[in-house]
Design a protein with these regions (language model features):
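Intrinsically disordered, low-complexity regulatory segments
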Residues: 1-165
C-alpha cells in the first residue's frame, strides 16, 4: 500500500516526514507533498453567471450559486500536486491539514475541485511533536470519521460567501 500525505504547509509536511522516517515500521509507504494554505478559492459571482458581475442589480438578488464552485487560487501549486498524484500510483491520500474545521476545508475543497477519487485517511494530530505524530501515523483514521467537520467547513464557507455577496 502506498499513500501520499498532503500537509497544509511545508513545515508540517517536514515534521510528519521526520516522524515517518523515525517512527516505523509502518504497514504502508508514504510520499509527501504540501499545500501552502488555501490553494483553492470560491468562485466569484461573475464566474457563475456573467450577469452577476458588479455592479449588482436588485433583480438578480439573492445570488445563490448551485452548486458552489472552487477554483485554483495558486495554479502552479495545484498543478504540481496533481501531477504528483497522477504519476504516483497511490492507493490512498492522507489528509494532514490542520486538525480543525478549516483544515478539513482546505483539503476537501482541493480534493473535490480536482475530482479526486482515491480513498482518504486522516492524520489527526494537534501538535507537531515527533512522538505525537508517530502515534497519529500509526493510527490513521478513516476520513468518514470527520464527515461532520467536513460538512461544517463547507456550510461555513458557503454562508460566508452568501453573506458577503
Amino acid at each position: 500500500m502506498r499513500g501520499l500525505v498532503l500537509a497544509e504547509k511545508p513545515s508540517l509536511m517536514r515534521a510528519i516526514e521526520g516522524a515517518y522516517k523515525d517512527g516505523g515500521p509502518f504497514p504502508f509507504d508514504l510520499d509527501f507533498a504540501a499545500f501552502h494554505g488555501h490553494l483553492m478559492r470560491q468562485a466569484e459571482p461573475a464566474e457563475y453567471n456573467p450577469k452577476w458581475a458588479p455592479p449588482y442589480k436588485a433583480e438578480d438578488l439573492p445570488l445563490i450559486p448551485e452548486p458552489f464552485k472552487y477554483l485554483p487560487d495558486d495554479v502552479p501549486s495545484v498543478n504540481k500536486i496533481m501531477t504528483k498524484i497522477r504519476n504516483g500510483k497511490y492507493d490512498f491520500l492522507v489528509n494532514a491539514c490542520d486538525a480543525e474545521r478549516e483544515g478539513e476545508h482546505i483539503f476537501w475543497s482541493f480534493y473535490e475541485a480536482n475530482n479526486l477519487k482515491l480513498p482518504v485517511k486522516r492524520l489527526w494530530c494537534s501538535t507537531t511533536l515527533k512522538a505525537d505524530l508517530v502515534v497519529a501515523l500509526h493510527n490513521l483514521r478513516d476520513a468518514s470519521d470527520f464527515q461532520h467537520l467536513r460538512e461544517a467547513s463547507f456550510f461555513r464557507a458557503q454562508f460566508d460567501w452568501l453573506a458577503g455577496m
